[in-house]
Amino acid sequence: SEMCIRDRYGISGFGLARNLRIPRKEAQGFIDRYFQRFPGIREYMDETVKFAKENARVETLFGRVIHTPEINSKGPTAGFAKRAAINAPIQGAAADIIRRAMIRMPKAIATMPAKMLLQVHDELLFEVAEDAVGPLVEVVREVMETAAEPVLKLDVPLIVDAGQGAHWAEAH
């Protein structure tokens, strides 16, 4: 997981070695093998940066535009802009999906003794009568798992986990 997370943020062999407390050569080997094993990731990164440099923007899967005006800068600013350009379509698509689910949710739960309270990243928190938890989970799961549709038919299904508790921490 260190590799998947660090990859999006452009970690170097030096940075990975420092984080894992291993020799730099070994860390660079991890990075090289990672990109050999998952060549599509490098391709995505390269294509996204190229597009951002040519257009000063990137887009989410839903076509929402995220501007990247610093992408052609020099020095550390360019590195930050490059990492942001790579990450923005991924996090932006996740934000688009949760937003679409939130827009659909009030209608979906209108007849239930439940209220959507807040959103935190990719989670929605509800207040619900205890005897309605099961039916609410079914409705919420359906709304969230199909939130990308009909605009997108995803190749990988969205899977929703649910928890319950007297408070947010307990629900995890």
Predicted regions span which residues?
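Conserved catalytic core of nucleotide polymerization and phosphodiester-bond processing enzymes
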Residues: S1-E2, R6-H172
